[in-house]
UniProtKB/Swiss-Prot annotation:
GO terms for molecular function: IMP cyclohydrolase activity; phosphoribosylaminoimidazolecarboxamide formyltransferase activity. It holds the Pfam family AICARFT_IMPCHas. Its EC number is 2.1.2.3, 3.5.4.10. Pathway: Purine metabolism; IMP biosynthesis via de novo pathway; 5-formamido-1-(5-phospho-D-ribosyl)imidazole-4-carboxamide from 5-amino-1-(5-phospho-D-ribosyl)imidazole-4-carboxamide (10-formyl THF route): step 1/1; Purine metabolism; IMP biosynthesis via de novo pathway; IMP from 5-formamido-1-(5-phospho-D-ribosyl)imidazole-4-carboxamide: step 1/1. Signal peptide: none annotated. It catalyses: (6R)-10-formyltetrahydrofolate + 5-amino-1-(5-phospho-beta-D-ribosyl)imidazole-4-carboxamide = 5-formamido-1-(5-phospho-D-ribosyl)imidazole-4-carboxamide + (6S)-5,6,7,8-tetrahydrofolate; IMP + H2O = 5-formamido-1-(5-phospho-D-ribosyl)imidazole-4-carboxamide. This is Bifunctional purine biosynthesis protein PurH.
Length: 510
């Protein structure tokens, strides 16, 4: 008779699985709570201490850490010396292990949990058994996922080592992710920002039709502990499944909308905001965002930091949009937008924006870049007027608004704006004056009337950008400064009667 060891914290489906094993002529060995559940259900089951001949100790910390368990798991069945050692020590082989681990992740997500309580949910015996069984996959089945119960029962008659190897790989991924969560939890408590080893845990969320292009395979993984303010935490109410590009654009859009406490609407296209509006109401903000670039908004992503009302929903309904994401939708507004079959409607709690991930990562060939997200906001008190003319209070407000937007635009980045409304966005040009021209041409083509203000994510290397801006209606400029030719730009601004302020903080976005 073969033997199976079952020890699970989540008992879902375990009785039926054990009954299937008994029907396949397995003896069942079990521990603690799992033993009680199986025994109560009428499953023939042997308590673990009858196998180890040693009682549980240290409040259950030591139950399965015993040679009678690990010897039975690790012995190579085709190695005579291994089998002789088992016989000498009266150890019987164990042919299947079914374990899911103490709920460490669920425990640390509870706000009232102390570190001592969390530590008690670090499983030791479970991962040890999983690793022993997985190492010996040629002979042992190792089951960590309830979704595999039925398939494992079906595979028992096949004796397929390929399937056991599949289960073993899954078990090692499972224990690696579990250990990574523990390491991350303790590192956070120890305030370690950049550890010597970095292990990040992500769970499969959904398959994607394709990646950026149709010939690229893709999937979406969410952090094992996703922040409350993230696309992974958003709830989809309506529409088709998200695409790879949808997810990236929506992520970019919510970051801009979260910059502002006032009602804000962001139109995002290809990872760049094409229109941003602030207003006294969300509809007012929508009108400004739409007017900023009514062409590029087609097929875009809309993020709003207030509930979508009926008036705004009616306006959105008139356009082809990929996604609308907001804290909520008024019932009548939702009914209006749900008439469009393909639009994706999502909700996200913008009040949790302060809890967004502190760090961001970018993969490169052979490595991973990790940095703090650019969360700093330039304040009025930090601005240094470097020209003879100082900006007016209205201009200063418009400059700070534009500066909050420009840090979300691909470098070289320029934003032309008035108070609470972008008018033109120049993104991703290889020279700064090129972005200036694009932003201003867009503002003027949309029929916007000067005066405007201009924000730059980095310094002007020459005075040509300042000259062009001044000649096309710009009255005030905000930029970090820091060029060896800053004085040339200052002189040009003075010559043209433009005010300019320095922030001493760059906002590159590559």
């Amino acid at each position: 008779m073969k033997r199976a060891l079952i020890s699970v914290s989540d008992k879902t489906g375990i009785v039926a699985f054990a009954q299937g094993l008994v029907a396949a002529d397995f003896e069942i060995i079990s521990t603690g709570g799992t033993f009680s559940v199986l025994e109560k259900a009428g499953v023939p089951v042997t308590p673990i201490d009858e196998v180890t001949h040693f009682p549980e100790m240290l409040d259950g910390r030591v139950k399965t850490l015993h040679p009678n368990i690990h010897g039975g798991l690790l012995a190579k069945r085709d190695e005579p010396t291994h089998m002789a050692a088992l016989a000498e020590h009266e150890i019987a082989p164990i042919d299947l292990v079914c374990v899911n681990l103490y709920p460490f992740k669920e425990t640390i997500q509870k706000p009232e949990i102390t570190q001592e309580q969390a530590i008690e949910q670090i499983d030791i015996g479970g991962p040890s058994m999983l690793r022993s069984a997985a190492k010996n996959f040629k002979s042992v089945y190792v089951v960590v996922d309830q979704a595999d119960y039925d398939e494992t029962l079906a595979q028992l008659q096949q004796d397929d080592v390929t399937y056991r190897r599949h289960l073993a790989a899954k078990a090692f991924r499972h224990t690696a992710a579990y250990d990574s969560l523990i390491a991350g939890y303790l590192s956070d408590a120890d305030a370690v920002e950049f550890p010597e080893k970095l292990s990040l845990t992500y769970d499969f969320k959904q398959a994607l039709r394709y990646g950026e292009n149709a010939h690229q395979k893709a999937a979406f993984y969410q952090s094992a502990l996703p922040s409350a303010f993230s696309i992974a935490a958003a709830h989809q109410l309506h529409g088709k499944e998200l695409s790879y590009n949808n997810i990236k654009d929506a992520d970019a859009a919510i970051k801009v909308a979260a910059e502002f406490s006032e009602p804000c609407v962001v139109a995002m296209k290809h990872m760049n905001p094409c229109g941003v509006g602030l207003g006294t109401t969300i509809y007012d903000a929508w009108q400004k965002a739409f007017a900023a670039d009514s062409v590029s908004i087609f097929g875009g992503i809309i993020a709003l930091n207030r509930e979508v009302d009926v008036q705004t929903a009616n306006a959105l309904h008139e356009l082809f949009l990929e996604i609308v994401i907001a804290p909520s939708f008024a019932p009548e507004a939702l009914a209006i937008l749900e008439k469009k079959k393909n639009i994706r409607l999502m909700t996200l709690d913008f009040e949790q924006a302060a809890k967004a991930d502190r760090f961001e990562t970018v993969s490169v060939l052979g490595g991973l870049l990790v940095q703090e997200r650019d969360r700093l906001t330039d304040q009025a008190s930090e601005l240094k007027t470097v020209t003879t003319k100082a900006p007016t209070e209205d201009e200063k407000e418009a400059l700070l608004f534009a500066q909050r937007v420009v840090k979300h635009v691909k470098s070289n980045a320029i934003v032309v704006a008035t108070k609470g409304q972008t008018l033109g966005v120049g993104a991703g040009q290889m020279n700064r004056v090129g972005s200036v021209k694009i932003a201003l041409e867009q503002a003027l083509a949309n029929g916007m009337q000067a005066p405007f203000v201009l924000a730059s994510d980095a310094f002007f290397p020459m005075d040509d950008s300042v000259a062009y801006a001044a000649e096309h209606g710009i009255t005030a400029i905000i930029q970090p400064g820091g060029s060896i030719k800053d004085q040339d730009s200052i002189d040009m601004a003075n010559q043209k009667g433009v005010s300019m302020v320095f922030t001493n903080r760059r906002h590159f976005k590559h």
